[in-house]
Amino acid sequence: NEKTPTINPFDIEDKNESNIKQTAKMILSILKDINDDDKFSGAMSDVLENCIPVLLRKGNSSFIELYRFMNDKRNKDLIELGKKSINDLESEYFEDKFCDSSLSTTKEAVARRLRKLINDELFSNLMNGKSTINLEQLMNTKGKIIIFRILKSNMLHSYKFYARFIIGIIQIFALKRANLEEK
């Protein structure tokens, strides 16, 4: 198994609600674009809009854990975390809706999308686990030039999603820096 650098979008240092919302929106927007036989539905969006922020607040999370969130046989601890969310709407969602049997096909459809990413070993190594690169710190270091060398041939099906996640993360850091400079 080759060593790869990791930039995990779920591994965020800044856990203020604004950053969590921005990061969750970025992750959701990219997951929507994964080609699958299932059309991306409002119910799928609803599930992800509630699950992703819970994992971002929790910390030490990943796409693998988001995938586990969709498995009702293995997600009891994550549901409990959702019920304790500081966001009242999320808390209510996990209390009242998430375990409803009518959502099982929706969660399976979300899991299929996630599996497409997780099954790509290189993508999984690059995006899951503890981040080994502090991209925000590197971006804020004067005079630093950051180059990503991504071999498309090694990630035929997940290459564009990996690139979009990196661009999304960079945009969040850049917007945060712009906000700091204004203050």
Predicted feature residues:
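P-loop NTPase motor domains
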Residues: 1-183
